[in-house]
Curated annotation (Swiss-Prot):
Keywords: Cytoplasm, Gluconeogenesis, Glycolysis, Isomerase. One of its GO terms (molecular function) is triose-phosphate isomerase activity. The keyword Transport does not apply. Pathway: Carbohydrate biosynthesis; gluconeogenesis; Carbohydrate degradation; glycolysis; D-glyceraldehyde 3-phosphate from glycerone phosphate: step 1/1. Belongs to the triosephosphate isomerase family. The lineage of its organism: Bacteria, Pseudomonadati, Pseudomonadota, Gammaproteobacteria, Vibrionales. InterPro entries: Aldolase_TIM (IPR013785), TIM_sf (IPR035990), TrioseP_Isoase_bac/euk (IPR022896), Triosephosphate_isomerase (IPR000652), Triosephosphate_isomerase_AS (IPR020861). This is Triosephosphate isomerase. Its main location: cytoplasm. GO terms for biological process: gluconeogenesis; glyceraldehyde-3-phosphate biosynthetic process; glycerol catabolic process; glycolytic process. The gene is tpiA.
Amino acid sequence: MRQALVMGNWKLNATKGSVEALINGLVDAAKDNATVEVAVCPPAVFIPQVEALTADTAITYGAQDCDVNTSGAFTGENSAVMLKEFGCKYTLVGHSERRVIHGESSEVVADKFAVTPENGLVPVLCIGETLEQFEAGETKAVVEAQLQAVVTKSGITSLNNAVIGYEPVWAIGTGKTATPEIAQEIPAHIRSWLAEQDAAVANKVQILYGGSVKPANSAELFGQADIDGGLVGGASLDAVEFSKVISGASA
């Protein structure tokens, strides 16, 4: 049985004070919902602080991105080696904001995916369609292509030690949430697509749903057969709200 995972992506938010308050406010939720893994992905500058604050807790953490290179003249980047040294378990790769704002292709995402397990991190592969692609009925083709880039680069079994985050781009931070039935349809398709290549991988890999996940809808979303938790944005910045989302995964 796949363990539930609820991961907060703080994006470009937080201060030293808010990080301390937020982590301290999540300690009980992580302890009380023992069947759920609770993780946070802070901005890189706050990772050392999160490392210290989570030392004696059940909270895990990761980065929002990592570079394809492990060292060198790459100003502004953070390598998987560096992130691992500061205790990160995870790193997001291919978040839609990286794909759209920074122009990261599926091939670049596949390169980032490949370098993370080589250096001890678990990649959280983010995939999903835009509103235009959704309305054109292209969702399944889009997520298949995004997955195929990784499979071509690293092989299907690389997903044994990875997490998939499905985020319909049109639902991220917009307040527009897919119904539980629609939210379940694409993770189910992802698992079916994987099963055609390796049934064991398909059964093992955790698939998270992201896109305006909040306390009011978390239990119903996480209750779907092929959704193993959530990749949570805005609600993860409030300890009370995020704790309720976490509880939804253990309901």
